[in-house]
């Protein structure tokens, strides 16, 4: 029976965050943080005590799980944000305060509406970045159905249409693609 890769063997969040440019003293948010804090907890370590990290999710149970893990690990620079990035103004983080936002395994949400991208624009600082990571289509897996996978070129097109430019497209792991965008300045 084949093994199912997990943790860093599937998606190394530390490597991806650093690739996106996350460094000491930055402010970062993960939109759709999920139950494990797979991106926010490594981000807390990368940005250090002078930085701020926001775990954003609409599911309170997911946020409670992340908060419990953060408390066990004595993380002090993590903010739990119950919010809806699919609604304009739905994320209660100060406008223009974030250096980097990530959307991990939520590309299907991005394809339904431009609101998440506009919400990211509202919250990003000038020259802010967005990291988008999702499942590659056409790679057989029992983890995620093929119908739930989104092509990276479709996401690329959406972000460009909303004032971002692509900095990098890359393989984010054995079953994931990654895109890094920068908010274009007028």
Short names for language-model regions:
Residues 7-27, 38, 42:
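Conserved alpha-helix/loop element of class I SAM-dependent methyltransferases that forms part
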Residues 19, 25, 50, 75-77, ...:
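A generic structural signal for alpha->beta connector loops
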Residues 23-26, 86-101:
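A short acidic, Gly/Pro-enriched loop at the edge of an enzyme's catalytic core
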Residues 27-90:
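Class I SAM-dependent methyltransferase SAM/SAH-binding core
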Residues 44-48, 114-129:
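A short glycine-rich, Lys/Arg-flanked "PGG" loop and its adjoining helix->strand segment in the class I
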Residues 98-113:
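A short SAM/SAH-binding and catalytic strip from SAM-dependent methyltransferases
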Residues 129-158:
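Conserved class I S-adenosyl-L-methionine
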Residues 162-186:
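Core SAM-dependent methyltransferase catalytic element
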């Amino acid at each position: 029976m084949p093994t199912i890769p997990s943790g860093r063997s599937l998606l190394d969040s530390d490597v991806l965050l650093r690739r996106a440019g996350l460094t000491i003293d930055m402010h970062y948010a993960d939109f759709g943080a999920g139950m494990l804090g797979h991106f926010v907890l490594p981000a807390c370590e990368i940005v250090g005590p002078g930085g701020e990290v926001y775990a954003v999710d609409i599911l309170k149970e997911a946020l409670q799980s992340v908060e419990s893990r953060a408390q066990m690990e004595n993380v002090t620079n993590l903010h739990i944000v119950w919010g809806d990035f699919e609604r304009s103004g739905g994320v209660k983080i100060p406008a223009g305060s974030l250096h980097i936002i990530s959307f991990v395994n939520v590309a299907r949400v991005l394809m339904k509406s431009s609101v998440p991208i506009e919400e990211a624009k509202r919250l990003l600082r000038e020259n802010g970045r967005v990291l988008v990571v999702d499942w590659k289509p056409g790679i057989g897996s029992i983890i995620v159905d093929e119908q739930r996978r989104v092509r990276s070129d479709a996401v690329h097109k959406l972000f460009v249409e909303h004032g971002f430019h692509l900095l990098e497209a890359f393989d984010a792991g054995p079953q994931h693609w990654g895109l890094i965008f920068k908010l274009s300045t007028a």
